[in-house]
Structures are given as structure tokens and as C-alpha cells.
């Protein structure tokens, strides 16, 4: 997490997900800062995160979901709020496959991605 420039950097599974940059949406920035200050890290072990998520969801009466479901939600919100499809793929760490134009020549800045992610409207 880069707090100075407000973005996440990560991904370890595939070439396209490694070192990907995802801006921190302004609506979640306070939660990110608070969690980092309290715990010193954003997320701990996946198993612990999953178990904590299950307990929290059950406590507020929401059916069980996995952490991976958050990726589906993010992707759906990108579609709903007209985030550029190529930028949605970049932020999710998806490959451009045979799309040579975007794979080789598609360069986007942090600010470009920030403009796109801020299209997602979050209720207060």
C-alpha cells in the first residue's frame, strides 16, 4: 500500500497481476488508513480474513460470501459505472491475451486509473 500516492500495488498469481497498480477509492481511503494504523498491515493471512469475514457477515445477517466475491462485486460496479473495460481488466490483474494493442501499447498512469475508479459512486 502506498499511502503517499494512495494506491495498492500487488498481485502474485500471474504475470498480468504482478505489480499492478490499483488506486484507493476516496470512499475507502479512511478505512485503509485506520486499518493500517491499527494493525500495521491491510490484510493478514487469507484463512484469518475469510473466517473474520464469515463471522462479520453472519453478525449483520448477510449470507456467507468469500473474499473472492469482492472481486466480482468490484467488476460489476465497474460495469455499472462505465469504468473503461481495459482499466477494469488492469485493476483486476487480468490478461489482455491476444489483444496485442492493449497488452503492449496500453499504458495508463495512476491518475488515469484514479479517474476511472472514482466513477464508482459510493453511498454515504
Pin down the residues of each PLM region.
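Conserved tyrosine-mediated DNA breakage-rejoining catalytic core shared by Y-recombinases
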Residues: 1-31
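Exposed loop/turn and edge beta-strand positions of beta-sandwich/beta-sheet ligand-binding modules
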Residues: 4, 18, 61-64, 69
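Active-site/catalytic core of tyrosine-dependent DNA strand-transfer enzymes
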Residues: 23-63, 74, 86
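DNA-binding alpha-helical recognition surfaces that contact promoter or target DNA
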Residues: 51, 77, 90, 107
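Short, basic/aromatic-rich helical patch in the C-terminal catalytic core of site-specific tyrosine
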Residues: 67-82, 88-89
